[in-house]
A protein has these predicted regions:
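Charge-dense, helix-prone N-terminal extensions
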Residues: 1-113
Length: 113
């Protein structure tokens, strides 16, 4: 099973990515000024999955290991457990998608080179 620290390291290897702690115990990965991964307490990771329809397809695919993210789920964010249920290569794909979606929303001047 991959640890939260290892997933955070994977997130931070992305161009322009950096770690922030906007609240006590809240660990997030950002690109520019936008969050692309919520790592929280290490038991789960919140990721942008596209529009709500795309996010709902992932809820069906990972039933029991994924849920709509509180407060922002209606905007296409899901939370995925980090208990090993989701294979590491698929989790990397989910992180890559979240990063790519967030970078696409950044103004061109703030996008990583």
């Amino acid at each position: 099973m991959v640890s939260q620290t290892e997933w955070l390291g994977y997130c931070l290897c992305k161009p322009g990515a950096w770690q922030d702690e906007p609240g006590e115990g809240d660990v997030v990965a950002k690109v520019g000024d936008k969050i692309f991964a919520f790592l929280g307490d290490g038991s789960a990771i919140g990721l942008k999955c596209g529009d709500r329809e795309a996010a709902d397809l992932l809820l069906d695919r990972y039933r029991g290991a994924a849920s709509k993210t509180a407060y922002i789920g209606q905007h296409g964010w899901n939370t995925f457990t980090l208990d090993g249920t989701i294979p590491p290569d698929e989790m990397r794909d989910l992180i890559d998608t979240s990063y790519r979606l967030i970078v696409a929303k950044l103004p061109k001047s703030k996008r990583p080179a």
